[in-house]
């Protein structure tokens, strides 16, 4: 086991502070509408230029192991806030730096870190309650666009596209972000339920030009096992052929005699049909088939519930308005399922989302929910160069997260104003002396986001903070125009969830660092001196 180096007390705190400052100073220049860019060198190709705080934070790794510990802890603040709320990473970093800086001064002067921590925690709880009280719920398309615009670094195009996407697919709908082929950023809406399985044979195609199958008002047969023998299906196919309606068959696999018979019937014009493999795998496949059954008002043909293929009647089949199938995807539009059954299924999936501990399972459940509830929107991000494309795509993803957060918990005035207004919630708190000092740390730190936004805009932070304190309500400083305006009317708003997570995560990590009394790291290995060079003339060997 390699030897360790240990630093205590003052030495440890100095190293932590240096690491925190190194990372925070690189990140906080990106804050606000007039935040600066940060260029990040890559091992190959052009440097990455970004204004995204968490991207900058993730790139920072310090040579000194002790300083790096401080930097990594603050990096955790940024990435946690990004994961949970989608935005507010730079704000969280600024708050963490401010809380730790003020707190470490008091610890050095002899105060108990645990008492300070208790004061900080109580202060944060009071501010979070105040933020919730000041929060304003949103559903208006214009407000959603404003949130998207601010989170995308004041790009109104992105804000409007996100707003339109959320209007079309609802707040539970799936909105994905992809790279476009051209320079324009555009929105594509996929209505109905879409899953990533196409036709099993191109002979089913009805539109040869687009290579896709279109069925209007079809019957939908859902089977959880493979279908290879035809004899079990013949009675059902005869009944469907008599009605003159087309058929969509979804099963684990369709092969052999069954597939050949369906293709022959389609080509002869006896039965317009298409066979598709079921989406997903294992238990997830069964759940997705059940989703389709509920959506279309049919039954899943499964031996688990005692339904066999030979006994299936037209009443067991689902129906919908339209089905479109290409080689990769199947889209079911306007399923004829019972409204109450669909709502019951939605509640069940929501309950599973709440209970699951796995991020992967949660993501898959949310996809299923979105497919039943609304549809899928795809934002295709266009740009002139590869570097711009990556930067813009990251901004769109951030803005999308923040917009969802705003719809979920509401909004507060942006530009650091919500934090300034929340300072009043700390005025009446009476705590023991050292805990009161912890509360004062939070009071001072709450000014820091506005101070930094003003500094990045080239203004004097302290003057701006005092002017905003003198005003009231939603009035604050618009760094873009350098005017004092009503933030809500000007569209400068933050999701409450983002402000809340930024403060909670910053206080959590800063408190942890304040109560750190010792640091342990591996000693750097001493470099061995190189071997001496061989003599150039070794003489002659006889």
UniProtKB/Swiss-Prot annotation:
Question: Where does the record say this protein resides?
Answer: Cytoplasm
Signal peptide extent = none
NCBIfam families under this entry?
A: GroEL, PRK00013.1, PRK12849.1, PRK12850.1, PRK12851.1
Q: Which reactions is this enzyme annotated as catalysing?
A: ATP + H2O + a folded polypeptide = ADP + phosphate + an unfolded polypeptide
Chief location bin:
cytoplasm
Its Gene Ontology biological processes? protein refolding
Record's family? Belongs to the chaperonin (HSP60) family.
Keyword terms = ATP-binding, Chaperone, Cytoplasm, Isomerase, Nucleotide-binding
Positions of the UniProt region annotated as Disordered: 523-542
UniProt protein name: Chaperonin GroEL 3
What EC number(s) does the entry state?
5.6.1.7
Partners and quaternary state?
Forms a cylinder of 14 subunits composed of two heptameric rings stacked back-to-back. Interacts with the co-chaperonin GroES.
Q: Which residues bind ATP?
A: 30-33, 51, 87-91, 415, 494
GO molecular function of the protein, one example? ATP-dependent protein folding chaperone
EC primary class: isomerase
Query: What is the purpose of this protein?
Result: Together with its co-chaperonin GroES, plays an essential role in assisting protein folding. The GroEL-GroES system forms a nano-cage that allows encapsulation of the non-native substrate proteins and provides a physical environment optimized to promote and accelerate protein folding.
List, alphabetically, the GO terms of the cellular component aspect. cytoplasm
Keyword Chaperone belongs to the record: yes
One short Pfam name that applies is Cpn60_TCP1
């Amino acid at each position: 086991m390699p030897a360790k180096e240990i630093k205590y007390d003052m030495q440890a705190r100095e190293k932590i502070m240096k690491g925190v400052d190194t990372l925070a100073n690189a990140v906080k220049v990106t804050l606000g509408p007039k935040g600066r860019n940060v260029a990040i060198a890559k091992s190959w190709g052009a440097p990455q230029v970004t204004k995204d705080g968490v991207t900058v934070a993730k790139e920072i790794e310090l040579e000194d192991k002790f300083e790096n510990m401080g930097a990594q802890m603050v990096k955790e603040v940024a990435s946690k806030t990004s994961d949970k709320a989608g935005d507010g990473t730079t704000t969280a970093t600024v708050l963490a730096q401010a809380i730790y800086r003020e707190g470490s001064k008091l610890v050095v002067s002899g105060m108990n870190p645990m008492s300070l921590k208790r004061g900080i925690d109580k202060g944060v709880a009071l501010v979070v309650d105040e933020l919730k009280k000041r929060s304003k719920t949103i559903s208006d398309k214009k407000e959603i666009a404003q949130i998207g615009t601010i989170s995308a670094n004041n790009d109104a195009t992105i804000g409007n596209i996100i707003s339109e996407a959320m209007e079309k697919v609802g707040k539970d709908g799936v909105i994905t972000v992809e790279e476009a082929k051209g320079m324009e950023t555009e929105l594509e809406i996929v209505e109905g339920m879409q899953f990533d399985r196409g036709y099993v044979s191109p002979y089913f195609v009805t539109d040869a030009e687009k290579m896709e199958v279109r069925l209007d008002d079809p019957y939908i047969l859902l089977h959880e096992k493979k279908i290879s023998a035809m004899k079990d299906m013949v009675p059902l196919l005869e009944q469907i052929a008599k009605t003159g309606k087309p058929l969509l068959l979804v099963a684990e696999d369709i092969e052999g005699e069954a597939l050949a018979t369906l293709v022959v019937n389609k080509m002869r014009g006896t039965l317009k049909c298409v066979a598709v493999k079921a989406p997903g795998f294992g238990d997830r496949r069964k759940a997705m088939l059940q989703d389709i059954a509920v959506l279309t008002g049919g039954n899943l043909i499964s031996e688990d519930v005692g339904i066999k293929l030979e006994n299936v009647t037209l009443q067991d089949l689902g129906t919908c308005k339209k089905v479109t199938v290409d080689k990769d995807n199947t889209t079911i539009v306007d399923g004829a399922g019972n409204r109450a059954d669909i709502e019951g299924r939605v509640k069940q999936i929501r309950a599973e989302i709440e209970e699951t501990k796995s991020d992967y399972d949660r993501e898959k459940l949310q996809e299923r929910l979105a497919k039943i509830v609304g549809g899928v929107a795809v934002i295709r991000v266009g740009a002139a160069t590869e570097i711009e494309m990556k930067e813009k795509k990251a901004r769109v993803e951030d803005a999308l997260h923040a917009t969802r957060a705003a719809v979920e918990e509401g909004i507060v005035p942006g530009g650091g104003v919500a934090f300034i207004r929340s300072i009043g919630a700390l005025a009446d708190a009476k705590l023991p002396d050292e805990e009161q000092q912890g509360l004062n740390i939070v009071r001072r730190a709450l000014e820091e986001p506005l101070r930094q936004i003003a500094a990045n805009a080239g203004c004097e932070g302290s003057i701006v903070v005092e002017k905003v304190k003198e005003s009231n309500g939603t009035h604050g400083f618009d760094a873009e125009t350098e005017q004092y305006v009503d933030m809500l009317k000007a569209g400068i708003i933050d999701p409450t969830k983002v402000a809340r997570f930024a403060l909670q995560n910053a206080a959590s990590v800063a408190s942890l660092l304040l109560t750190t009394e010792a640091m342990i790291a591996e000693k750097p290995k001493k470099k061995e001196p190189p071997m001496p060079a061989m003599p150039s003339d070794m003489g002659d060997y006889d």
